[in-house]
A protein has these predicted regions:
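P-loop NTP-binding site
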Residues: 11-139
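GTPase G-domain guanine-specificity segment
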Residues: 1-11
Length: 139
């Protein structure tokens, strides 16, 4: 609601679509165990991991904290994973991917795809409408 109010204050009448970001692996994760490294807050990270079609054995919501990543990599559940699913962030590359390379663990990069929350308008339609308006203004 605060975000909608802020948008309305600078762009009255502009359509808004509340979304959540869903993890989207760059390639299939397969049948092995997966450790999921994400920037999502701890209270959301586990529910996002549940949406993955994979055997997620560990969730690490600390991608911006190199020390926390090192501590997580020392955990048995993380170290035992056959695949690391990793959002692309500097610390993830420097710490997690380096560890994976040294230990023969497969890395799959993860994107975050916006999905409208239930009851919200279609995001693609709203974006197309906004793009059409922008093009019309430049014509």
């Amino acid at each position: 609601d605060d975000t909608r109010e802020a948008i309305e204050s600078v762009a009255p009448g502009r359509a808004t679509v509340a979304v959540t970001l869903r993890p989207s692996p760059a390639e299939p994760l397969g049948d092995g165990s997966v450790a999921f490294f994400t920037t999502a807050p701890p209270e959301r990270a586990s529910s996002l991991a549940e949406r993955l079609e994979a055997d997620v054995v560990a969730v690490v919501p600390a991608l911006s904290d190199r020390q926390a990543l090192r501590e997580a990599l020392a955990r048995d559940d993380v170290a035992a994973a056959g695949t690391f699913l990793v959002e692309v962030k500097a610390a993830a590359i420097e710490v997690v991917c380096e560890y994976a390379a040294e230990h023969g663990i497969r890395v799959v990069f993860c994107d975050n795809v916006p999905e409208p929350i239930d009851g919200e308008p279609d995001l693609d339609a709203a974006l197309l409408e906004l793009a059409s308006e922008a093009v019309a203004l430049r014509a």
